[in-house]
Amino acid sequence: MAETDSGKTAEERIPFNYFKKIPKIELHAHINGSISSETIKKLIQRKSTKEKGQNNVVSQWETTILKGDEKNLDECFKMWDFIYPLVDDTEAVFLVTKSVIEDFAQDNVRYLELRSTPRANPKTGMTKESYIEAVLAAIEEAKTTVPDITVR
């Protein structure tokens, strides 16, 4: 922490919680780029339960994503190679979308515009249409679970 003239750090002068309380808007949030580590852990558990022999998913998560705090741009983009296989059916799309909305609501975001590119996956039966339907269903459910946030 950098010291200020008063001898206090910025965090000591203005606690992080102060910023969390301020109402916010988010105008460009990519669903798959906003997934929390807790939700990724749920997706890993879900995937490894559904598909035996997926222990390499946990190993890949640990080496790609949890490899320390500092990453170069190439390492950041490797995240997608890991996330897309976890979000490959409509149930996962719904879970991720709902979780992302709840996470933004927890940070006191009052207006959220989500972005995503619908993907089909013949192996799981997910079509681009069912992908969009899952996103819209999660947004609709969020209206009751986190009513203080407007999602588009």
Language-model-detected regions and their locations in the chain:
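Metal-cofactor-binding active-site regions of metalloenzymes
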Residues: 2-152
